[in-house]
Curated annotation (Swiss-Prot):
Important for activity (site feature) positions: 97
HAMAP family, sorted: Glu_tRNA_reductase (MF_00087)
Summary of subunit composition and partner proteins: Homodimer.
Additional detail: During catalysis, the active site Cys acts as a nucleophile attacking the alpha-carbonyl group of tRNA-bound glutamate with the formation of a thioester intermediate between enzyme and glutamate, and the concomitant release of tRNA(Glu). The thioester intermediate is finally reduced by direct hydride transfer from NADPH, to form the product GSA.
The keyword Oxidoreductase is assigned to this record: yes
Protein name: Glutamyl-tRNA reductase
Native species: Ectopseudomonas mendocina (strain ymp)
Function: Catalyzes the NADPH-dependent reduction of glutamyl-tRNA(Glu) to glutamate 1-semialdehyde (GSA).
Binding site for NADP(+): 187-192
GO process terms (BP): protoporphyrinogen IX biosynthetic process from glutamate
Family: Belongs to the glutamyl-tRNA reductase family.
Pathway the protein contributes to: Porphyrin-containing compound metabolism; protoporphyrin-IX biosynthesis; 5-aminolevulinate from L-glutamyl-tRNA(Glu): step 1/2
Length: 426
């Protein structure tokens, strides 16, 4: 079996490419089933966020080329374009990569906790799709356990820093006094929830949450004393909004240049600060061409994020060591499982040989042979049959120059432990 982790992220691909490779929640189950049907992958899970799209796969033999081709075809990209920004990790490196992702060590925001929840969602969807088997199931559980240890035993999660925090920090640089500002938040997911919390804690004057469903918007709005509206109400709310932060799973832009131009006229060209955290983007890039709009994408938040990461750098090394230990522990358990399978097969073979010799012994007794002769024949027959296959294989391997096979056999059968010594050499 071969395990691989394959994908793109914020370090290897621009937001333009990432939004083209992103999977919507509605696509995931069908995509997983298609992936297992059309590639050599027996097990599969897909993690798709604004900063990364990754595939975790178990295959009979490592075959990343076919998976890359499937991914390019699925999203209608050229294979060369995808290869230019894709990475592939295999076996132990893939395990380590997945654990680093879960711990936030590979995130744009070092140590951010949201990625673990997103990875758990990816696991749940893969289970729903029926594409998680023994290996991925064990790996996900080991990954979650390691991430929990990292959160508990290091300071990687202290001093909250996230894309949401960075967006609010940037807003504070533009609007020094948030107490007088009004914010329009588009979406109602985890990131927007974090944005709302940070804005609320900063004492912003008013928050409006716009979402596809009013019920979900209301649930979030109630937590922070905000107002809930539908996406169709956005044009009316824009004119009153100093800050607009958007993060939905929409495949098409929600906010266009025309709507923003109209809002600016009503605001008498008072500036609007916008952050588009979504991938694919919620706000048309052309909006950034307007004179009174400060439009930032998730990639533009790097500088703000870097300034808030210094306190986490010390904890990162301790987290890396825990990830290394978690990786080695998982690989050791995999090796032990492989040994269990071999031992099970060997025991079944031995029991079959035992039953054959026992049947012969019973026939000898029926035919009148003495118990002493039957026992002697049973012992000889069982010994010869148990030793036949290993003896033939050992002779063949040594004839081929595999002298190491002798040492391995000696260790395997404990021939150097308690072996009778040749007294003639004493």
């Amino acid at each position: 079996m071969a395990f691989i982790a394959l994908g793109i992220n914020h370090k290897t691909a621009s937001v333009e490419v990432r939004e083209r490779v992103a999977f919507t929640p509605e696509q995931l189950v069908e995509a997983l089933q298609q992936l297992c049907r059309l590639t050599p992958s027996r097990e599969a899970a897909i993690l798709s966020t604004c900063n990364r799209s990754e595939l975790y796969l178990e295959q009979d033999q490592l075959s990343s080329d076919e998976v890359l081709k499937w991914l390019a075809d699925y999203h209608r990209l050229s294979l060369d374009e995808l290869r230019a920004c894709a990475y592939v990790h295999s076996e132990q490196d893939a395990v380590r990569h997945m654990m680093r992702v879960a711990c936030g060590l590979d995130s744009m925001v070092l140590g951010e906790p949201q990625i673990l929840g997103q990875l758990k969602s990816a696991y749940a969807v893969a289970r729903e799709a029926g594409t998680v088997g023994p290996l991925l199931g064990r790996l996900f559980q080991a990954t979650f356990s390691t991430a929990k240890t990292v959160r508990t035993d290091t300071a990687i999660g202290e001093n909250p820093v996230s894309v949401a925090f960075a967006a609010v920090s940037l807003a504070k640089q533009i609007f020094a006094d948030l107490h007088r500002s009004q914010a329009l938040l588009i979406g109602a997911g985890e990131t927007i929830s974090l944005v709302a919390r940070h804005l609320h804690d900063q004492g912003i004057k008013r928050i409006v949450v716009a979402n596809r469903t009013l019920e979900r918007a209301s649930q979030l709005a109630e937590q922070f004393g905000a107002h809930a509206v539908l996406l169709s109400d956005i044009p009316d709310e824009l004119a009153h909004s100093d800050i607009v932060i958007s993060s939905t799973a929409s495949q098409l832009p929600i906010l266009g240049k025309g709507a923003v131009e109209s809002a600016l006229k009503k605001r008498k060209h008072k500036p609007i600060f916008m952050v588009d955290i979504a991938v694919p983007r919620d706000i048309e890039p052309q909006v950034g061409e307007l004179d009174d709009v400060y439009l930032y994408t998730v990639d533009d938040l790097h500088e703000v994020i870097e300034e808030n990461l210094k306190s986490r750098q010390g904890a990162a090394q301790a987290a890396e060591e825990l990830v290394a230990a978690g990786t080695e522990d998982f690989m050791q358990r995999l090796r032990e499982l492989a040994a269990v399978d071999v031992l099970k097969a060997y025991r079944q073979q031995a029991e079959r040989l035992r039953d054959e010799e026992l049947a012969k012994a019973q026939r000898m007794l029926v035919n009148g042979a003495s118990a002493e002769d039957v026992l002697a024949q049973l012992a000889r027959g069982l010994t010869n049959k148990l030793l036949h296959a290993p003896s033939v294989r050992m002779k063949k391997l040594t004839a081929e120059g595999r002298i190491d096979a002798l040492s391995l056999a000696q260790e395997l059968f404990a021939l150097d432990e308690g072996a009778p010594q040749d007294k003639g050499l004493q």
